From Swiss-Prot:
The gene is waaA. The keyword Transferase applies. Gene3D superfamilies: 3-Deoxy-D-manno-octulosonic-acid transferase, N-terminal domain, Glycogen Phosphorylase B. This is 3-deoxy-D-manno-octulosonic acid transferase. The chain crosses the membrane at residues 12-32. The lineage of its organism: Bacteria, Pseudomonadati, Chlamydiota, Chlamydiia, Chlamydiales. It comes from Chlamydia muridarum (strain MoPn / Nigg).
Length: 430
């Protein structure tokens, strides 16, 4: 009875949230063309199909970052368990695009996650009948999880984390927090801080293991420095200094636009990479307002013509980082966002900068600051911090070396996570 009531209340909450967001969704559909290609699956009109026979593992991540970190895990699973079928879902269209690019060539079925209303997601879960469900970082959905468990599936959270704000909300509604995560068989978390937070909302300690942060993992074949290749592609001269501003939101653009023209004395080029392409016009308007002349990647404009380019393309941010002399991770000047993946620039051996709002990964950001791996900036010291790094190659190299050391020391996370999951897979009856 309690589970039925929880489910109905949860359905009611989702409907209310959807109605509240409906005007914004309508705006994105009409003016940006979003959700047009995915609405049939989102609303259960069209059911996804998985070809072939054999056991099925279903991976899920919210968006680009959560989906991308699954890559070494999925490749390893495919290598050691070739008879399994793979499904990868994401909530955002950017996440689905990334999953298709990374995992469709490996034979995975990729689609957007249907809405978690019981009448929509439950038939999909029953149809696919997964043996294993793996959630990336924390994007668990109650009906999806409960439906899979009813069918006897094992459910795991990997690279798990719980922000301080989420912990407070779940602690206030401790029964809901316990109900929300209790069906999980195992939570593989990033560190002890997140372990304490999950325990505060009622998750027993024997369901928790710590493996480290999967985003520190670098595959040998993908860790080759593509710096020369991409600098040549970008038409950069040896004397040019390139700043890559990744995953940018409008508030990040506002801050950087105020200082960008002060870097000309260093022969500086800037790539502005929006987090959401539907915000492209707003990004362009902010640069125009600041008097910054810029080109567009999609028009094949080059850094020979402009000192700034807006990269209105998906899936190339990591490659662009490899060409940079300095990288900034966006969302960190926007208190409503709280940052994105801080480790991508380090993986490409580039000095890292981020703003003051990093609550989405505050534990990692504090660790990076403490070990002097990343440079934390605010509006007041941004110009000075950038100029200091641009004019001092030795200082930039010192940050690169500390970043390499940090990743090397943290780089056992994937092996640990895989061994934990492998021990669980061995117990699954197929």
């Amino acid at each position: 009875m309690r589970r039925w009531l929880t489910s109905r209340l949860y359905d009611a909450f989702l409907v209310a949230a959807f109605l509240a967001a409906a005007p914004r969704i309508f705006y994105k559909v009409v003016f940006h063309g979003k959700y047009i290609n995915s609405w049939k699956i989102r609303f259960g009109v069209e059911k996804p199909q998985v070809k072939g026979e054999g056991p099925l593992v279903w991976f899920h991540g919210a968006s680009v970052g959560e989906v991308s970190l699954l890559e070494p895990l999925l490749k390893k699973w495919r290598q050691e368990f070739p008879d399994w079928r793979f499904v990868v879902t994401a909530c955002s269209e950017a996440g689905v695009y990334t999953a298709q690019r990374l995992y469709a060539p490996l034979g995975a079925t990729v689609f957007v996650l249907p809405l978690d209303l019981s009448c929509i997601i439950n038939p999909v879960v029953r149809s696919l009948s997964p043996q294993v469900v793996i959630f990336s970082e924390g994007d668990c959905w109650l009906h999806f999880l409960m439906g899979a468990k009813k069918l006897g599936a094992k459910a795991f959270l990997i690279n798990g984390k719980l922000s301080e704000n989420s912990c407070k909300r779940f602690a206030f509604l401790k029964r809901l927090g316990r109900s929300y995560f209790a069906p999980l068989d195992l939570l593989v978390l990033q560190d002890k801080v997140y372990k304490q937070r999950f325990m505060q909302i009622g998750i027993p300690e024997d369901k928790i293991q710590i493996s480290g942060n999967l985003k520190t993992f670098i595959e040998t074949e993908t860790s080759i420095n593509n710096r020369s290749l991409w600098r040549k592609k970008l038409k950069l001269s040896p004397s040019d200094r390139l700043i890559v501003l990744g995953s940018m939101h409008p508030k990040d653009v506002e801050v950087w636009a105020d200082v960008a023209q002060h870097f000309n004395k260093f022969s500086t080029k800037i790539l502005w990479v929006p987090r959401h392409l539907e915000k492209l016009k707003e990004h362009a308007r902010l640069l125009e307002k600041a008097g910054i002349s810029f080109g567009l990647w999609s028009k094949e404009d080059s850094l020979l013509q402009y000192d700034s380019l807006i990269v209105d393309a998906m899936g190339i941010l990591k490659d662009l980082y490899s060409a940079a002399d300095l990288a900034f991770v966006g969302g960190t000047f926007d208190p409503l966002v709280g940052g994105h993946n801080l480790l991508e620039p380090l993986q490409k051996e580039v000095p890292l900068m981020f703003g003051p709002h990093i609550h989405s990964q505050s534990v990692l950001a504090e660790l990076l600051r403490t070990k002097e791996v990343g440079v934390s900036v605010d509006k007041e010291n941004l110009l000075e911090a950038v100029e200091n790094l641009l004019e001092d190659e030795k200082k930039r190299q010192a940050y690169i070396e500390r970043g390499k050391s940090f990743l090397k020391n943290a780089g056992t996370s994937f092996e640990h996570t895989w061994e934990i999951l492998k021990s669980q897979i061995a117990c699954i009856k197929i």
